[in-house]
C-alpha cells in the first residue's frame, strides 16, 4: 500500500514475481554488471509496468513494490560467471479489465519483460574502452579458442 492512494485489501490486488533483467549476454551483445543490477534494484521500486514501450498513462498496468538481485544456484552466464537476475514483485488491481491479463500471467503466457533505463557508461569487456571512444574489438566477435563471446558490453546504471 506504499504506492496506493488508499489502503487496498489482499482481495483487491494481484501480486506476482517477474525477472526484469540479468547479467547474461543479451541479443545486443550487452550485459549488466552485478553492480548495475544492484543499482537497478533500487531504481525500479515504485516504477510502473507498461506494454509495448508505450509511456502513455493509459498503458500503465502494474507497479513494482520490491526488487532484489537473485543468484541462481549452479547456473552460469555465457562468460562463466554466476548467473544473477534482477527480480521484482509487482501488483495490479483485480479489475474486470485486468482479468484476462491475470489469467495469462497465471498460465505463463505473459512472462517476458523488457526494461528501460539510462546508463552512465558502456564499456568494452575486453579492453575497458568506453563505447563512445571506440576500440578495435567487434561486438559479438568469437575468436577461435577464446571466450564464448569476446565483447559483451558492460552496462553501468547512471543518472538520466
Segment roles from a protein language model:
Residues 1-160:
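Signature of dsDNA virion morphogenesis modules
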